[in-house]
């Protein structure tokens, strides 16, 4: 075999070519999307918001890959010109809009989609560009929705999927570990040490998206005006139904391929209020992802989702499976709205019960109202992303409750939720201030009897401790009581098991209870921490915290593209696409090539 050695003068040129090829390969695709939001009416004369003509109370699915750039232009036609010009603040808020990309972290603050805080409001007839690059570390199931008034329950929402090789490998490795097991037991899946030898595409895997939501027969703005913000308004208007994939009907079917061996279900609770319960009759659910975080595969029979939460589950089908009954319970004030849908294999003979009434949500196998914060654990790779320190520099405690005393009603015109005696609008004016790149424990104490779903913007959090209903508030200087005891027990559990705390962006906090969440403040800007029940948000239940920018690490504020175009059409030639921060994988490849070139050069000189 003839060996061709490179001359030294060839090495720099070869190196430049190879590095250019690598960087070009790492640059993702650019997706240019245009969303036109307008109001439409359903056959039932119910006013909804439609994005690009979609009428199922959900907008188009966005599907990208890690490292891709998204250029999304949103134009607002939600209200008529006459409605948009009304003096009422309630109308002004509803007639303006913005988009929040729920759970996408990291993302520069100017693209967080909070009108009047992180961006200008998008008024009637105006357009706004969201131009950013998905970070290489971001992967999984997310969703987008309006953060203006109560728009998203009317249809201003959709699913955002970020694909990546690590995700596909995680699914394939899990399949490799369970494919020869006849009966799957609840709990952590024992993963095979040998990695999968097949690509994910070699298996018969069918992916389906399942969106779950509550539903109100009346227009949300009417409900907000008449039943929530009035002087006698309450906190939780009764919803009338539920939606699965935007449909209110029961007994619908979802077709899958005849040769399907595994179902991969991305489930999103995109509702305004109700916790959702999900179950597949006779099948185990292998949980692979929670809120965009890949987890060590964990098997359950029934799972619940707080508003804003997402799970990806893998389902191993049986050889004789023709159809699967899907059971969904949408939690209302007293009980559940129960629906049953069916997955069926193409070509299968269907003889389905028309209106089966043998389901009690609370008697489903494995049913629990509790969060799986102790059970599920991020993969080793995911845990490295959250660079929290062992000991926080400070603990911030936030107590919230509902106030309907006369002084509150006189000041706000209605009863309001307050966090540490302040409403959300007051935190907008005067945020809680954190240091940059510091680790904090945030304690959220519910002095309210109801369960509340909380969501954090801009950061993931670790769940250090989570109380049960009735445990009471946790205060670090009160070292007694149920809350203190549970907190200590959770710390001992983490120390004894060596488990990493679960990482999420959304969580349910039980009534008269608490949560201790640990964050590292890496992203500068003003960020929200709020209840994701839309009515509660309108009633003041949330805070704003601010992370400062530092001169020595100012690039942290621009891990994504930084240009946006409020109200005016941009010149396409001037749109800047800034790549995400360089990832370790690229560095390793580049170093490897440098070493190989150096070895080649040494080899050449030795043989001269």
Swiss-Prot record:
Q: Which organism was this protein described from?
A: Saccharomyces cerevisiae (strain ATCC 204508 / S288c)
Task: State the disulfide connectivity.
Answer: none
Keywords noted in UniProt: Copper, Ion transport, Iron, Iron transport, Meiosis, Metal-binding, Oxidoreductase, Repeat, Transport
The identity of this protein, by name, is Putative multicopper oxidase GMC1
Which Enzyme Commission numbers does its entry carry?
1.-.-.-
Swiss-Prot/TrEMBL cofactor(s): Cu cation
Instruction: Identify the residues that the record assigns to the Plastocyanin-like domain, covering every copy.
Output: 51-163, 243-374, 421-548
Gene3D superfamilies tied to this protein:
Cupredoxins - blue copper proteins (2.60.40.420)
Q: Which residues bind Cu cation 1?
A: 100, 455
Question: Which residues hold Cu cation 4?
Answer: 452, 531, 536
Q: Which PANTHER family match?
A: IRON TRANSPORT MULTICOPPER OXIDASE FET5-RELATED, MULTI-COPPER OXIDASE
Residues annotated for Cu cation 2 binding in this entry = 102, 145, 532
The record's family statement is: Belongs to the multicopper oxidase family.
Q: Where is the signal peptide?
A: none
Q: Which Gene Ontology cellular component terms are annotated?
A: fungal-type vacuole membrane
Q: What else is known?
A: Present with 589 molecules/cell in log phase SD medium.
